Amino acid sequence: MKLRANRVGEQMKKELGDIISRKIKDPRVGFVTVTDVQVSGDLQIATVYISVLGDEEQKENTLKGLAKAKGFIRSEIGQRIRLRKTPEISFEFDESIGYGHRIDTLLHEINKEGKREE
């Protein structure tokens, strides 16, 4: 069953990217990238991880805009993907991109310090 949940998650990720970029007209929703979709084993709940370009205020506004459009997004997913029941969708920020950027910055600093000591 886990394989099916992964396949549904990948298909939802592809469709959500298209829906958010082309169908959502809310001005609060800025430049959004869907980084991952985790679907529960029973295909009832989908957690959508997003990355938003901008400051904290823009991120919060984007999350509010997506929450407002959740019903529309779910109905679009239901039309595009044939499932018995469309999963309940929740949006969360993907912190891994910022975390990865921080690690990259620290590694560059360590590399610079190592070259100075030589």
From Swiss-Prot:
<comment type="function">
    <text>One of several proteins that assist in the late maturation steps of the functional core of the 30S ribosomal subunit. Associates with free 30S ribosomal subunits (but not with 30S subunits that are part of 70S ribosomes or polysomes). Required for efficient processing of 16S rRNA. May interact with the 5'-terminal helix region of 16S rRNA.</text>
</comment>
<dbReference type="Pfam" id="PF02033">
    <property type="entry name" value="RBFA"/>
</dbReference>
<keyword id="KW-0690">Ribosome biogenesis</keyword>
<comment type="subunit">
    <text>Monomer. Binds 30S ribosomal subunits, but not 50S ribosomal subunits or 70S ribosomes.</text>
</comment>
<dbReference type="InterPro" id="IPR023799">
    <property type="entry name" value="RbfA_dom_sf"/>
</dbReference>
<keyword id="KW-0963">Cytoplasm</keyword>
<dbReference type="InterPro" id="IPR020053">
    <property type="entry name" value="Ribosome-bd_factorA_CS"/>
</dbReference>
<dbReference type="InterPro" id="IPR015946">
    <property type="entry name" value="KH_dom-like_a/b"/>
</dbReference>
<dbReference type="InterPro" id="IPR000238">
    <property type="entry name" value="RbfA"/>
</dbReference>
<dbReference type="GO" id="GO:0043024">
    <property type="term" value="F:ribosomal small subunit binding"/>
</dbReference>
<protein>
    <recommendedName>
        <fullName>Ribosome-binding factor A</fullName>
    </recommendedName>
</protein>
<comment type="similarity">
    <text>Belongs to the RbfA family.</text>
</comment>
<dbReference type="GO" id="GO:0030490">
    <property type="term" value="P:maturation of SSU-rRNA"/>
</dbReference>
<dbReference type="GO" id="GO:0005829">
    <property type="term" value="C:cytosol"/>
</dbReference>
